[in-house]
Amino acid sequence: MDSIDTKRLNDSNASDRALSGCAVLFLGCSSLEHNFLSLYKDERGKFSVFKVIKLTLSDSVGGLEGYEILKLHDADPYLGVELKFMAMPPCQRFLESYACGSLTQFLSQHASRLLALPDGVEIETQLKAGVHTLDHSLQDIEICLDHIRQSQPVRLRDDEVTQLEQQLQNSYGPPSQPPQELPRNCFLFQKRVFDDRPLTPADQQRFAAHVGRDWKRVGRALQKNCRALKGPAIDNLAYEYEREGLYEQAYQLLGRFIQSEGRSAKLSRLISALEETKMTSMAEIMLGIQPRD
């Protein structure tokens, strides 16, 4: 009997994690002249728009697994992004990020870096699965998941998306070479070598200005090798500086890390934590890497 119950439990867990379905994310701007659709239609801006979308999805879902972009299409005045989900956890994280506004925040950050959107432009989004507008059901994620399950893909990935994916991969550099020994006080990021050094107040300010709601995720990664951030330390920081806002919470987090670790609080450890939490674009900001068009 126990073995039967265990099998049912395992089957149930597998069923809970399995998911196949589609959703369409519509992206728009308050500016009629400078918006995602017009920039995507312009051959000079197409790749940059695609990169903004990929970075936004990676930050929202926490990685690149469990979903794919099938097609980008004209849904005037919006740019429609058709997404296929192949697993429950990434789909659920996507919905939660969309519901709490994190996805829009990520989109705004990446668009301001990579696209020439004028100051003051407001980003508009809408999410649909089949005939259902999921924005009306975000208070109940299970309903949204059911609608996505019912919306099955009717096409394979568009050739243009495949080409853009390949262009994005190529933009990160040539194929990997045989591993070489790194010089002392250096570290590797995206196949490039960077000088390692202790974190500075300028790093602290840059981190706080850009990390937003994800400062806690970075803190959880840093706490694995930092005694001062273990236990309830991160939650205590969140509570203590709640009134001051996200900037101060993030600033104090990295300050606590620097104060505790001294000269061992190095840039490489922060970049490693950002990589672990799939925050590649944030790592690029900390390293001052200019986006590639």
UniProtKB/Swiss-Prot annotation:
Example of a GO cellular component annotation carried by this entry: tumor necrosis factor receptor superfamily complex
GO BP terms in the entry: extrinsic apoptotic signaling pathway; positive regulation of apoptotic process; positive regulation of canonical NF-kappaB signal transduction
Keyword field contains Transferase: no
PANTHER family named among the record's database cross-references: TUMOR NECROSIS FACTOR RECEPTOR TYPE 1-ASSOCIATED DEATH DOMAIN PROTEIN
Annotated organism of origin: Danio rerio
Domain notes: Requires the intact death domain to associate with tnfrsf1a.
Protein name (record): Tumor necrosis factor receptor type 1-associated DEATH domain protein
Quaternary structure and interacting proteins, as annotated: Heterodimer with tnfrsf1a.
Gene3D superfamilies: Death Domain, Fas (1.10.533.10), TRADD, N-terminal domain (3.30.70.680)
UniProt keyword Nucleotide-binding, yes or no: no
SMART domains named in the record: DEATH
